[in-house]
Amino acid sequence: WIRLGPLSFQPSEIAKICYIFAGAATLERLFHKRNLTLFIVLTGVCIGLLGLMSDFGTAAIFFVTFLVIAYMRSGDFATLSLICGGAVFGAGIILKFKPYILSRFASWGHAWEAASTTGYQQTRTMSAAASGGLLGMGAGNGWLHNVAAADTDLVFGMLCEEWGLLIAVLAVGAIITLAFFAARACRVGRSSFYTIAACAASSLLVFQTCLNVFGSVDLLPLTGVTFPFVSNGGSAMMSAWGLLAYLKATDTRENASFAIARKHQRRLTQAARRRVEPIGDPFGTEKEERHEEN
């Protein structure tokens, strides 16, 4: 965290927006190995800095986002396989120098066996989620808020407890809907920059949601990432809305193109109507009728 007087923010959240912008801008033109090399270097620097800050959940999010952007421009599975192999090797080195990270994996899959130690948060989250049922206990009526990070890392359990499983599933479904929207935008997008940015942003949001939801119920190790648009925190909320702006920008460009087409079509229709509208008395019939009356 960086503190500026009474304000504090998490730089990794702001870096998500900048990273997608840099990746989409770097690979917007025709694919070149030089562009991919620069992007790989940028990704390595970002993940390395996140590792120094011990924010390995966000580092995993950056890596998955990198794979999405790189594949969209290259489509080369061989290169991506080598990158994944290097990432596994790097993760092994990190675990060697920071062995405390393994404690998060120690209780993975059997949190109830360590309910009072490393599995404390997950077991409390699962109990609270189960007590909420389908419709929940009501806003503010739960007890999970007494557990540390209940409104950030464990917010899915808090959502299930107070608002019910139905609302929690709808919240996850809303993030998945954004991914379907991004996939549709890829097929009709006019700009490769916005297409790459929209898909990368939606992939980031979906993967981050999976880490938060599955981590809180012990299906994945608890990584400490937030639930987009739901978790408490100004930095996380600003980051989520910033990522959503990429999808909106793609939609604006598409709608703008349709608006231009409709405007052009409207002009053609008006011009055609003017050509076919009858001119007042083109055959002089009124003059003949007046002559007969006289």
Predicted regions and their residues:
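Hydrophobic, glycine- and aromatic-enriched re-entrant/interface helices and adjoining loop segments
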Residues: W1, S81-A171, R190-A197
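Membrane-helix boundary/helix-loop-helix interface segments in multi-pass membrane proteins
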Residues: W1-M53, V213-P228, N232, A236-S239, ...
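Hydrophobic alpha-helical transmembrane segments
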Residues: K16, E161-A182
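Alpha-helical transmembrane segments of polytopic integral membrane proteins
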Residues: I20, A24, L50, K98, ...
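Structural signal for the C-terminal ends of transmembrane alpha-helices
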Residues: G23-F31, L67-D76, I94-L95, I176-R187, ...
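Interfacial segments of multi-pass membrane proteins
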Residues: A24-L27, T65-T79, W143-I167, T226-W241
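Hydrophobic alpha-helical segments of polytopic membrane proteins
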Residues: K33-L52, F56-K96
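Loop-to-helix entry and N-terminal half of a specific, functionally important transmembrane alpha helix
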Residues: C186-G224, V230
